[in-house]
Amino acid sequence: MDLLIALLPALFWGSVVLINVLVGGGPYNQIRGTTFGALIIGIILLLTGNAKFDDLTIIIVGLISGAFWALGQGYQLKSVSLIGVSKTMPISTGLQLVGTTLFSAIFLGEWSTGVQVTLGLVAMVLLVIGIALTSIKGKNEASESSKNFGKAMPILLISTVGYVVYVVVAQIFGVDGMNALFFQSIGMAIGGLILSAKHETSVKSTLWNLIPGIVWGIGNLFMFYSQPKVGVATSFSFSQLLVIVSTLGGIFLLGEKKDKRQMIGIWAGIVLIVIAPLYSEILKHNYN
């Protein structure tokens, strides 16, 4: 039962961008609504006594990491509007894993031996190959799609910076868990407002996009529940399966068209993107 619950964060987080697309409204309504939805979960945690105001580090780190999450999510949604979910999510997930792994290795000393460096670089190569495979161009893909892909890549790089800072700021200061989520949700809401401030939004679309934000928050709660039960490494590894949920959801639920060649590339790429972090976790715990 605990292992099944540990799989739920991947299901919920992988569904967030799918729900964003299904309810529509464009990236600015989507990011505003999503961050406000996360704030609703944060307020519920506050009201149930799961937010503590006696640690200034948690408050500041929570606000900063939440704001950078909004940056990452907002630009990810901009990429989705250009190239779709099934192309955006594997690339985005792979780039995030590359960024967080390299940061942890270089600045937090997680690769402290020659064996760890060698195996870690192998994991990075697997990630890069996986990203490339999921990006294979279809035989009959229009030139407009190639132009949009070119526009999406710098957007995804900005998104990656947002997500990586969101993760590593918390790692640096040892801030984690349910106590930080309320402050993160405030940072997210502020970030969402800033990103959408100069763009036209509608109340109706923003309200619909509260749903994916609430779903994201619930995914976090399942993560917090499962970590003590199955361990941080297993919980983290399971959470990376979100890329399968979002990518296949984009193809089969949203109807994003792929030819046989692209489907083979997507499946192979997903396998590598999922295997690489598992491989990194193994080397982290077995080659100290």
Curated annotation (Swiss-Prot):
Database matches in InterPro entries: Sugar_transport
Gene Ontology molecular function: any one: carbohydrate transmembrane transporter activity
Record's signal peptide: none
UniProt key word Plastid: no
Annotated NCBIfam families: RhaT
The protein's role, per its UniProt record: Involved in the uptake of glucose.
Protein name: Glucose uptake protein GlcU
